[in-house]
From Swiss-Prot:
Chief location category: other
Disulfide bridge partners, by residue number: 354-377
Amino acid composition bias (Polar residues), ranges on this chain: 182-210
Positions glycosylated per UniProt: 370
GO MF terms held by the record: zinc ion binding
Family note: Belongs to the peptidase M14 family.
Keyword Cell wall biogenesis/degradation: yes
Cofactor binding mode and count: Binds 1 zinc ion per subunit.
Keywords: Cell wall biogenesis/degradation, Disulfide bond, Glycoprotein, Metal-binding, Secreted, Signal, Vacuole, Zinc
InterPro entries, sorted: Peptidase_M14 (IPR000834)
The protein, known as: Inactive metallocarboxypeptidase ECM14
UniProt source species: Arthroderma gypseum (strain ATCC MYA-4604 / CBS 118893)
SUPFAM superfamilies: Zn-dependent exopeptidases
Length: 593
């Protein structure tokens, strides 16, 4: 565009609009993101100031005017840390979408303390009326995301006991979201080319000291564009026992990638036995990034641990592992490009402006979509019929084919979610139905929690997925009558129940990862590796439990059962010290080529 034309356009716009900044103003100060070290969460003040003045999103004309000023003249808007930056450059330290402030600038997360069934019912009704986003729930609390201007309406629908029993968990949601996005500095994996990325798995057996190198891939949350090349690279370097497969196709046509890891007999003359397989998946809910990183971390640990750790080597000789980092690639990609808190898949529904089906409510066993059928805009929308969500249907088809065609026996299924630090076993749809092997499920669940506690001192609760948010805090008599968690978030039609019941996977679990609510779905990147380590240790404990031939056959009272189980236990106990010194060093520190 000619200079005179640009100048004319600029003067015309300048004369028609007041000279105010497009950056939201608050208390006579321009809105600025805090320094990277500052946290946006706050748990100190007991009551959120509901009526205080809030930041205003600039008008469309103002944003257009400022954009033209910057694009034509490249003018700086303010000085930060001695360096001039334009509005567009303010977010260059992060991959956060430009619409972040407009979408979540007025939102907060409140935690309500729940003591009675009546309070639960009141909160459920109010949440449904106002279409609120229930983030999570536990024994005696519920976290809800909402706009500041909706808080008075919510409190007005609640009994007096709840009106004063809430605290602000996240005061500045937009800032906390901003901090969760990967940093875009030159050393970040997402900013490096395929030939320069320093996250390639090391095939070296050298024992590098932890402080000498850092595992760059797990130092941040990685988008799909980085995750997929990383998976291909991992397989190319460990092709003897790792394979990249697709377990289906998404609504938008993407593959659902998975890593199959295991060591098969090399004697072709020997008929291969039925292959026992463990599935570990994550990312069913797109915004739960930590589940994607954790599945990737466990997969990397098993793949690189083969031949180095006797425990991992034994497990990969006994089982195949199928790691599915994200069963919802479309939604996961959307959280990076557009909306960090998107939950569902990206499938079209009967309402064009409300796409998406909740993948973990779309499975065929005990599907119940009646509660959300009329509202595709619901975060828990389960579709109009079972398996309407394409990704759930595709994975179910893959699983059935593995059993009927490929001679696979699924022995365990672990579905990673966030948050609240819970280990859940079937059933989720109803507490009236008890699993046939309840005692074994509880025993292994307790073992997983113990392994986590020994690794990181973090406590994970073990319970049935149907247990209510107030059940465990009330007496046993009241627990059976307590309002179930499905009142706040339906657990019918889950992958957990489907794999257990329809696929006869005797050891099925849903694990809700860190934390207990300080950050919710926006867990800081610094907790990726610690979370990965503790769940990796839990998966090793699961393998140790399942490797005994008497566990899966159910013959726990055979003449040699106790003796053989003890032999397996002794072998794994001898390996623990070696694992901690060798494999953990590789997992958390060295991934550079």
């Amino acid at each position: 565009m000619h200079f005179s034309v640009r100048l004319s356009l600029l003067l015309t716009l300048a004369s028609s609009l007041p000279l105010v900044s497009a950056i939201p103003q608050h208390e006579d100060q321009a809105y600025t993101f805090p320094s990277p070290g500052r946290s946006a969460t706050a748990n100190t003040d007991p009551v959120l100031e509901v009526g205080r003045e809030t930041q205003r999103t600039p008008s469309a004309w103002t944003r257009l005017r400022d954009s033209l000023v910057e694009s034509v003249w490249g003018l700086p808007q303010r000085k930060e840390g001695g360096e001039w930056r334009t509005r567009n450059q303010v977010t260059t330290a992060s991959r956060a979408p430009a619409t972040l402030q407009a979408r979540y600038g007025e939102d907060v997360v409140l935690r309500f303390t729940i003591k009675t069934q009546e309070e639960v019912k009141a909160l459920v009704e109010a949440s449904n009326i106002l279409f609120l986003d229930v983030w999570g729930s536990h024994d005696d609390w519920v976290d809800i995301r909402l706009s500041r201007d909706v808080i008075p309406s919510l409190l007005g629908l609640l009994p007096p006991s709840l009106q004063s029993s809430h605290v602000p968990l996240i005061r500045d949601l937009a800032q906390t979201i901003y901090e969760s996005y990967p940093k875009t500095n030159p050393s970040s994996p997402s900013q490096q080319g395929p030939t320069t990325r320093r996250f390639s798995p090391s095939a070296s057996t050298s024992k590098t000291k932890p402080q000498e190198t850092k595992n760059i891939f797990f130092q941040d949350y990685q988008p799909l564009s980085v995750l997929l090349p990383w998976m291909r690279l991992l397989v190319s370097m460990f092709s003897s026992h790792a394979t990249l497969i697709s377990v289906g196709t998404t609504a938008e046509g993407r593959d659902i990638p998975a890593l199959r890891v295991g060591v098969h007999p090399t004697n072709n003359a020997q008929q291969a036995p039925r292959r026992r397989t463990i599935v570990i998946s994550g990312g069913a809910h797109a915004r739960e990034w930590i589940s994607v990183s954790t599945v990737s971390y466990i997969a990397y640990s098993f793949i690189t641990g083969y031949g180095k750790s006797r425990s991992i080597t034994k497990l990969l000789e006994q089982f195949d592992y199928v790691f599915i980092p994200t069963v919802n690639p479309d939604g996961y990609a959307y959280t990076f490009s557009t909306d960090r808190l998107w939950r569902k898949n990206r499938q079209q529904t009967s309402l064009s402006f409300c796409p998406g089906i909740d993948l973990d409510h779309s499975w065929g066993y005990e599907w119940d979509g009646n509660a959300t059928r009329s509202n595709p805009c619901s975060e828990n929308y389960a579709g109009d019929q079972p398996f309407e969500a394409i990704e759930a249907r595709e994975i179910a088809t893959w699983a059935r084919k593995e059993v009927t065609v490929n001679n696979v026996q699924f022995v365990a299924f672990v579905d990673l979610h966030s948050y609240s630090q819970q280990i859940l076993y079937p059933y989720g749809h109803s507490c009236a139905h008890l699993p046939a092997n309840l005692e074994n499920l509880e025993e292994l669940g307790a073992g997983l929690a113990k392994a986590i506690r020994k690794t990181s001192r973090e406590n994970y609760d073990v319970k049935a997925a149907c247990r209510g948010i107030v059940a465990s805090s009330m007496g046993d008599k009241d627990a059976d009558e307590a309002v179930t968690s499905s009142a706040l978030e339906s657990t019918a039609g889950s992958a957990l129940d489907w794999f257990y019941h329809d696929m006869d996977v005797r050891f099925s679990y849903q694990i809700k990862l860190r934390d207990r609510g300080s950050y919710g779905f926006l867990l800081p990147r610094e907790q990726i590796v610690p979370t990965g380590k503790e769940i990796y240790r839990a998966m090793v404990a699961m393998g140790k439990f399942l490797v005994s031939p008497h566990i899966l056959t159910g013959d726990l009272n055979g003449p040699h059962a106790a003796e053989e189980t003890q032999n397996y236990d002794d072998d794994f106990e001898e390996d623990e010290a070696e694992e901690d010194s060798d494999v953990f060093r590789a997992q958390g520190d060295d991934m550079s080529s």
